[in-house]
Amino acid sequence: MSSYFVNSFSGRYPNGPDYQLLNYGSGSSLSGSYRDPAAMHTGSYGYNYNGMDLSVNRSSASSSHFGAVGESSRAFPAPAQEPRFRQAASSCSLSSPESLPCTNGDSHGAKPSASSPSDQATSASSSANFTEIDEASASSEPEEAASQLSSPSLARAQPEPMATSTAAPEGQTPQIFPWMRKLHISHDMTGPDGKRARTAYTRYQTLELEKEFHFNRYLTRRRRIEIAHALCLSERQIKIWFQNRRMKWKKDNKLKSMSLATAGSAFQP
């Protein structure tokens, strides 16, 4: 992981000391061990593979190094950060702690080689303090988000019982407006023997269907849909009506032909 980041970082910024780095001032303010782009690690800089600024704002109550980081990070605001992208102050990369090439003190800036043990102890305590702050803030953010998400849902859930109570009072049937009714007689009623009642069409619907049948005895699906919309009927009703009308027309023609045949044979000499 670190090798991929080092290669991409060195290719993006060929002159490391001459480039102005975000959250860390100019390149001259860094120590000599970090001026080489090949020696940079993901933990010491708040950058991901795609160049996003993932650094964490530090409080100014700590040492001057972390205070400068907090001020410069406020000067360059980063996008909305998610807790899963935050890195603890004591980690340098996503690998295991045993394989880390640097220590806790080196993750946020190189210390002088001749530092006293007291300085190392203070740096370790400060890094542990920042780690606890990060964990607390990361754990508090999901709780705040959950509370914000739950509060609007509760606010929306409260007016619902009021709306239902006003729409349908107790002991009363809901009011049915004229636009809720069907234009033709309902065919869902059942007769006394349990069979479906005969579909009753209005005079206007029957007249329009008869006119359409006069021009064409067989309908396409598109024309059937158009008639169903025009007459406020279902497509299935139009299909069944035309089937019944064709059977009636065939029966009438058969009877007419038979009567003509019998009449013709009667007049034969």
Curated annotation (Swiss-Prot):
It holds the Pfam family Homeodomain. It is found in: Nucleus. Residues 77-173 are annotated as: Disordered. SMART domains: HOX. GO terms for cellular component: chromatin; cytosol; fibrillar center; nucleoplasm; nucleus. GO terms for molecular function: DNA-binding transcription activator activity, RNA polymerase II-specific; DNA-binding transcription factor activity, RNA polymerase II-specific; RNA polymerase II cis-regulatory region sequence-specific DNA binding; sequence-specific double-stranded DNA binding. It comes from Homo sapiens (Human). Sequence-specific transcription factor which is part of a developmental regulatory system that provides cells with specific positional identities on the anterior-posterior axis. Residues 194-253 bind DNA. One of its GO terms (biological process) is regulation of transcription by RNA polymerase II. The gene is HOXB5. This is Homeobox protein Hox-B5. Spinal cord. Gene3D superfamilies: Homeodomain-like. Belongs to the Antp homeobox family. Keywords: Developmental protein, DNA-binding, Homeobox, Nucleus, Transcription, Transcription regulation. The keyword Zinc-finger does not apply. A motif (Antp-type hexapeptide) lies at residues 176-181. Residues 88-102, 113-128, 136-158 have a biased composition (Low complexity). Residues 163-173 have a biased composition (Polar residues).
